[in-house]
Amino acid sequence: VGEASRNIKNQMGGWTITWQGRGNSNSDFPRTLSIYEAIKNKVESIGGTVEYSNNGSYKTKPDVVIFVYGEEPYAEGDGDRKNLFFINNDKNFLSYMQNIKSLNIETVSLFLSGRPLIVNHELNLSDAFVQLWLPGTAVEGVADVIFTKKDNKIDHDFSGRLSFSWPRTSDQKVLNFGNMPYDPLFAYGYGLSYTDDVFVSKLSEENKFTQPNEITVFLGSAYPSYHEVVSYF
């Protein structure tokens, strides 16, 4: 479910052919599969069937529904944000997910973005959630990890881990690994494999950003300098 599964530009991101990357069409990537095509090829190769829908409707009740969604391509400027809440361009997308969930059909979310965002609503409605980032031209790898072999043996296990912390709230000020108090939603290095058995409690769905009353930008004396400043990476 989701136009993002069929629009290759969404898996490529900004600075792809064009600056923002939004005006690209699938024909601009002649040797690249869309996420939908990669999933369809994988499922059919092991004897299954796939049906596409842009709103969650179906002809035959599915065993599982895969939702593909995320940010539109962006670069600097157009991609700047005032907060970290994910806003789907399809305003009805959450209702599609809620409807499928109410039918007791298992749901998988494949999320496309170039940065961590607050997706608590979507996480609560997902039996499995995979952060794809921007997979580019190699979306066959997505299908490789989310499906097992026909005999249910693992084909390719998940090995990706978060390279930075995933925020718990949009106004979370302390988020860097090693800083205290350190309490992200998903910590630096977090990631699951098929052998993990993890239950994530229902998350807060309040889309509220709290402006701080006061921010200390600088405190102390700037002159004279008593020490040499050395950049450390």
Tell what function each PLM region has.
Residues 1-233:
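C-terminal non-catalytic regions of proteins with extracellular/luminal or membrane-system context
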